[in-house]
C-alpha cells in the first residue's frame, strides 16, 4: 500500500471541510436507517459511517495477520441495503452515524464515496480508533453532555477518515481525495477551495502547483479524472446553486461563486442541466 507523507505546512482539508459543513447524528439501528425516506427531496446529501466491533472469531489472513479490532464502513445513505447485507455477517454490533453534508461542496465529496469504502483499523491507528471507541462507549453508556460529545467525536472521526484516505490513495479510484495526496495538485485544489471567485486559469493554477502548464494539466487529469477547468466549473456551480437555493439573488450568487455577471451564471446552470439530460 502506498503511504503518502503529509506536508504539514499545506492544509489540504480545512477549506474543503468548511465547504462541506458536516452535521452528525447517531442512527440507533439498521431498522431506523431503513425507515428513512430516501425518495424525498434532500437539500443536504448524506453519508453513513458504520462503526463495527469485530467478532472474536474473525479469521486472520496472510494480508491481515493481526485481526483488526474495529472496522469502519462509509458510503451514501442510499447504500444502506448493501451495508446490511455486507456487515451483519461478521460483526457483533454496529453504530450508524449519519453525516449530513450541509455545505455547498457536499455533492463534490459525495462523489468520492460513489463506491462504499471499508476500513479495518487497529489500536495503532489512533486517528480512527480513538474517536470510534469514544463513540461506541458513549452510545453504550450515555452520560451528561452526550449530544455535544458525539458531535465533536463525529467531527474528529470524519477528519480522520479523510486524512486516512488522502494519506493512503487508491490508484484505481481517481478523484478529489486521490488528487489531494499529490502535494503539487493539492496546492492548486486548496487555492481553488479557498478562493473560488478568483480569476483562475491554467497558468495561475500551474503556478500554484509549481509545475509547467502541460505537466500540471496532465497530472491533474490523471489524479482527478477531469481537467482543472472542469473541476473549477463544478466547484463554482455547486457554490452558485447553494447560494440560489438559500435565497440569494443571482447577482449575489455570481459574486460568491466567481461568475462575472448574472448572465454568466444563468448560462452555466442551464448548460449543466442540459448536459445531464
Descriptions of predicted regions:
Residues 115, 120-190:
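An amphipathic alpha-helical interaction segment
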Residues 17-116:
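N-terminal regulatory/effector-sensing and dimerization cores
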Residues 1-23, 119-120:
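A short, N-terminal "cap"/entry segment at the start of jelly-roll beta-barrel domains
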Residues 166, 187, 193-194, 198-235, ...:
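Basic/polar phosphate-binding segments, predominantly the helix-turn-helix DNA-binding elements
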Residues 125-129, 154, 172-200, 207-209, ...:
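A short, Lys/Arg-enriched amphipathic alpha-helix from helix-turn-helix/homeodomain DNA-binding modules
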Amino acid at each position: 500500500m502506498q503511504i503518502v507523507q503529509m506536508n504539514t505546512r499545506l492544509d489540504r482539508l480545512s477549506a474543503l471541510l468548511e465547504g462541506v459543513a458536516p452535521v452528525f447524528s447517531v442512527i440507533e439501528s439498521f431498522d431506523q436507517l431503513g425507515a428513512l425516506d430516501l425518495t424525498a427531496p434532500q437539500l443536504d446529501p448524506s453519508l453513513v459511517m458504520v462503526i463495527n466491533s469485530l467478532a472474536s472469531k474473525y479469521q486472520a489472513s496472510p494480508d491481515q495477520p493481526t485481526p483488526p479490532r474495529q472496522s469502519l464502513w462509509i458510503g451514501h445513505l442510499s447504500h444502506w441495503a448493501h451495508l446490511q447485507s455486507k456487515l451483519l455477517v461478521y460483526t457483533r454490533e454496529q453504530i450508524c452515524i449519519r453525516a449530513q453534508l450541509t455545505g455547498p461542496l457536499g455533492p463534490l465529496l459525495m462523489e468520492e464515496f460513489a463506491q462504499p469504502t471499508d476500513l479495518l483499523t487497529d489500536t495503532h491507528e489512533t486517528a480512527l480508533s480513538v474517536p470510534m471507541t469514544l463513540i461506541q462507549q458513549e452510545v453504550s453508556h450515555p452520560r451528561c453532555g452526550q449530544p455535544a460529545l458525539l458531535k465533536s467525536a463525529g467531527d474528529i472521526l470524519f477528519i480522520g477518515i479523510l486524512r486516512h484516505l488522502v494519506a493512503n490513495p487508491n490508484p484505481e479510484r481517481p478523484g478529489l481525495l486521490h488528487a489531494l495526496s499529490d502535494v503539487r495538485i493539492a496546492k492548486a485544489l486548496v487555492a481553488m477551495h479557498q478562493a473560488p471567485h478568483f480569476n483562475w486559469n491554467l497558468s495561475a493554477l500551474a503556478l500554484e502547483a509549481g509545475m509547467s502548464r502541460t505537466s500540471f494539466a496532465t497530472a491533474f487529469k490523471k489524479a482527478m479524472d477531469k481537467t482543472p477547468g472542469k473541476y473549477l466549473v463544478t466547484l463554482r456551480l455547486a457554490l452558485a446553486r447553494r447560494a440560489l437555493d438559500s435565497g440569494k439573488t443571482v447577482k449575489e450568487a455570481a459574486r460568491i461563486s466567481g461568475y462575472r455577471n448574472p448572465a454568466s451564471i444563468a448560462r452555466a446552470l442551464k448548460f449543466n442541466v442540459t448536459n445531464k439530460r
